[in-house]
Structure formats: structure tokens, C-alpha cells
Amino acid sequence: MNFVQQNREGDAILVSLRPDTLEDYIGQEEVKKKLYIAMKAAKLRNEPLDHILFSGPPGLGKTTLAFVIAKEMGKNIHITSGPVLERQGDIAAILSSIEEGDILFIDEIHRINKAVEEVFYSALEDYKVDIMIGKGPTARSIRIGLKPFTLVGATTRSGLLSSPLRNRFGMILELQFYTVKELMEIIKRACKIMNIEIEESAAQLIASRARGTPRIALRLLKRVRDVATIRKENKIISHLVEKTMDILEIDKLGLDEMDRKILRTLIEIYDGGPVGIEALAATLNLEIDTLKEIHEPYLLQQGLIIRTPRGRVATGIAYEHLGYPSKISGGLFDESLRKSDES
């Protein structure tokens, strides 16, 4: 397992660093503005907040925002995930226990069983669920009334949501990668909470290698803290960060060994591409979902690869970063290839 895939490692500490309010939440300014207006209006009307869908790559704060919403609205939050909702009875049991105005947070909502998803339609619109009892000719439908609630869904692949489910969300908010400056603020806030002293330059080094992702920034901070502890250093300084990054094999762009392996495979085995995602994943012995959800978004955002109708292509930036001679000068090569594939 590479560093970026360690989504659950040390999550207890990460949870303790979560902000409780929108004011304390750093970054995602446009999303925060929309949430502030929606929550304030719902409070003034004394009604539940509209259903919300958060989408974006892992680690950008979708779960944290769900907790912030519950805290700001003064309501309880009920947490589950799409893959565990296998039967209609599963969702009926959760929905029937919800109090008025509560928040139901469903992570990986795109992975909900389709039969369960259909139960949601009436629950989200009319606050009622119809459950089938029994099988065959003796089967009958029971309607259960629900207290008004707010569904907050989180997905890394919003395109996999069916239109009927997607259309029942009143707000669909796309989370963006964070800037280095925003990540520095998050790192310094975490250091203050954990009583760690850190140099400005050290915070910048960590932030610049965190792939625009708070979760990764905080994990990197923890690893740097480990190195500082072993070396009996009382303050996190730049050389400690650089030493830690060398140990973790994380380069200046924030790429780990698997990221570089993806790019090397594209360049060495597929001559830079294009190559289909299935073939690339099979060559790497990597799950397609891991490639598409964990690694590809950042590689795309950094301009290291592009997607074309014929598959993924390594860009001139990727060749340069890994020290390969470019087949053709970066920008011209990338643009001409993109146009030829789109024509």
C-alpha cells in the first residue's frame, strides 16, 4: 500500500483535528458561502436544510463538512456508507430512527444498491418509505412515515449517481484541491492543537507535497513529527521535512512511488500513450477504482497526464519531471494530440 492509499491510517488523530464551524473550516470558500446562506435560511424558516451532495477526490473535506453542518444546525448526525446499505430494510431502520432535522451522512453514495436507492426517492421528497414485506403472491407494501431530515451524500465519482437520485439533491457542491497557502493554514492550525512548534518554511514544504489534499497534509505532518521525536527535535524545521519526504519517497510534486510507476508505465511500456484505463490498471496490477479515484485526479490536475477518447496520455510535463527526453516539445505535443483525438 502506497502512502496516498492509506485512507484510514491514524484517522483517530485526524478526527480530533476537525473544525466544528464554517468559520474554523479552512478553504473551499465558494462552497462555504453557499452552505452559510442555505443554513441561515433554513434556521430562519425553522425547517430542515435541503439535501446536499458533496463530490470531489478523497480527502478534501466532504465528511468534515457533514459534521460541520450538523454542528452548525444543532442536530444529530447519523453516519453510514453506500456499500453497507444492501437491503431496503437497512435504510428503513436508519431512517425510522432519525429525529426531525437530523443529518444522515452517506459516504460513497454512488455505491448504494439500486434496490435500496429506489427507497430513497420517496424518502427524500415526501419523507415516506415503502417497504415490501414477504415474497411472491403474499408480498405486501408497508408505508412508513419519516420525520423531515437532511441527507448529505459524499462521492468521489458523481457521474456514477443515477439521474433520479442526483436530481433529488437541492445542492450539489464540488470540492476543489486546496492551495499551498490554505494547506499551510491547516498544518499550522493542527500544530497549534497538537502543541507542535513548526517553522513557516517547514509548513510550506509539507503543504507543497500534500497533493492539494488536507488529509494527506495532516498525515505528512504526523510522519514528520515522528522523525522529529526520534531525533529529539523540539521544533519541526525544513531539513526534518526533507528527510521525512526522502524516507516516504515523496517527491517535490507530491508524487509517491505508485504515481511515478503509473507515469513510467505510460512512457516506457505504452510509449507515452494513449492507453485505455483497463489496460493500464492491469499492467500496474492496480484496481481500476484505485487508479481513477486515488491517483488520476491529481495527475490530471498537475498536467502530468491527459484523458483523450483513445485513453490516457503522458504529457511533456511528465517526461520532464521523470527525466525522460520528450518525444516532441511538451505543450505542442500535448495540444496536437488532444486535438487529433477529439476530431
Swiss-Prot record:
CDD domains: AAA (cd00009). Its EC number is 3.6.4.-. Its main location: cytoplasm. It is found in: Cytoplasm. It holds the Pfam family RuvB_N. It catalyses: ATP + H2O = ADP + phosphate + H(+). Residues 179-249 are annotated as: Small ATPAse domain (RuvB-S). GO terms for molecular function: ATP binding; ATP hydrolysis activity; four-way junction DNA binding; four-way junction helicase activity. One of its GO terms (cellular component) is Holliday junction resolvase complex. Residues 252-343 are annotated as: Head domain (RuvB-H). Mg(2+) binds at residue 63. The keyword Signal does not apply. Residues 1-178 are annotated as: Large ATPase domain (RuvB-L). Homohexamer. Forms an RuvA(8)-RuvB(12)-Holliday junction (HJ) complex. HJ DNA is sandwiched between 2 RuvA tetramers; dsDNA enters through RuvA and exits via RuvB. An RuvB hexamer assembles on each DNA strand where it exits the tetramer. Each RuvB hexamer is contacted by two RuvA subunits (via domain III) on 2 adjacent RuvB subunits; this complex drives branch migration. In the full resolvosome a probable DNA-RuvA(4)-RuvB(12)-RuvC(2) complex forms which resolves the HJ. This is Holliday junction branch migration complex subunit RuvB.
